[in-house]
Amino acid sequence: MASCGEVNLTVDSLTSGKKVSGEAVPEGSGSPSSPSLPVPECPICLQSCVHPVRLPCRHIFCFLCVKGASWHSKRCALCRREVPEDFLERPTLLSPEELKASATGGCGTGSSGHAWYYEGRNGWWQYDERTSRELEDAFSKGKKSAEMLIAGFLYVADLENMVQYRRNEHGRRRRMKRDVVDIPKKGVAGLRLDPDPNSSAGAVPAPAVVDVSVDGAAAERESSADGADTGVSGGRPQGTFVPAPIRPPTILGGHLTSPASSSDIQLVQTLAQLNISPNEQEPEEEDAEDEDDSAAPDASGYDSESGTSDDDEQVEDEDENEHTDGSQGKHRLQQLNRPPPGGGPANSGDRSGCPDGQCTVTKV
């Protein structure tokens, strides 16, 4: 297990060669047994780093280990400092030459010059060196399947059908193959061979159009632990604009403001043929109002001159109303036969001089 000093190695200590595995090494005194720089250990998988990357907090991990940990939390596994959102697309590799060497067959390939690939979107990805060695060893021993731990997920490689899938999810399968090293490929273990030139320090950021494409690629690769991008693009959903419903015109006061329809015109014509007009009801309403006004009994208990004049006016009104319709005459006779509003019995002889029967005559 790595000690505390080995876990917190920085780039300066690696490049200068002053501290390796807790031992001081003088500068310029290269060891004949280890001509290259030692590979740091990953605090997550506790193994030698495969394609080591350096976070902004200067902690070093495997690229796939950082990718697997970022699905649970966008923070460093040691100091809990936030990791940039675009770090997986523009990682800071400690040795970019190692990535190119593994892609060209310099390391991670067997003596036969073959490498292992898994299917991606519009191309093939090469497995990392550690996984390639495990697959080559199982294939040389004639095994039918092999298990691989990639970014915290356990995968099963079916060497007979040449497919891989997660052990707890058999439905999602991806093709794999064993081929020569120098075939066209997209990259190694999710790391592209042609990285974005804007990823270098101090470069001008790319325009918004490039950022949208990068976000789409990141969403595609989130569906797999090994950096494949065969999943359906998980772009941000765009809301559909729904226009507001148009309210119907409000009828103020219950009267239609639109022109009369054909049904209204037909109704008016039918009423005209029957000699019925809405204006014919106005005299009847006026007579009813006059009757209500004259229905109040005199407080003095006897007829006055004003009462006699009222009777004369009512008689004249009755003569004028004789020219109205027969139905109105019957209605008028029914009003004349009503008892007086006083409630007392009225004599028929007393009502003979009063056309409406509402004005009583007191005998002395």
From Swiss-Prot:
Residues 102-178 form the WWE domain. Residues 18-37, 217-262, 279-364 are annotated as: Disordered. Pfam families: WWE. GO terms for cellular component: cytoplasm; cytosol; nucleus. The keyword Nucleus applies. It is an enzyme of class 2 (transferase). SUPFAM superfamilies: RING/U-box (SSF57850), WWE domain (SSF117839). It catalyses: S-ubiquitinyl-[E2 ubiquitin-conjugating enzyme]-L-cysteine + [acceptor protein]-L-lysine = [E2 ubiquitin-conjugating enzyme]-L-cysteine + N(6)-ubiquitinyl-[acceptor protein]-L-lysine. GO terms for biological process: positive regulation of canonical Wnt signaling pathway; protein autoubiquitination; protein K48-linked ubiquitination; ubiquitin-dependent protein catabolic process; Wnt signaling pathway. Residues 281-295, 308-322 have a biased composition (Acidic residues). A glycoprotein binds at Y118, R121, W125, Y155, Q164, R174, K186. One of its GO terms (molecular function) is ubiquitin-protein transferase activity. Its main location: cytoplasm. Residues 22-34 have a biased composition (Low complexity). It is found in: Cytoplasm, Cytosol; Nucleus. InterPro entries: RING-HC_RNF146, RNF146, WWE-dom_subgr, WWE_dom, WWE_dom_sf, Znf_RING, Znf_RING/FYVE/PHD, Znf_RING_CS. CDD domains: RING-HC_RNF146. Keywords: Cytoplasm, Metal-binding, Nucleus, Transferase, Ubl conjugation pathway, Wnt signaling pathway, Zinc, Zinc-finger. Pathway: Protein modification; protein ubiquitination. Its EC number is 2.3.2.27. The WWE domain mediates non-covalent poly(ADP-ribose)-binding. This is E3 ubiquitin-protein ligase rnf146. It comes from Danio rerio (Zebrafish). The lineage of its organism: Eukaryota, Metazoa, Chordata, Craniata, Vertebrata. The gene is rnf146.
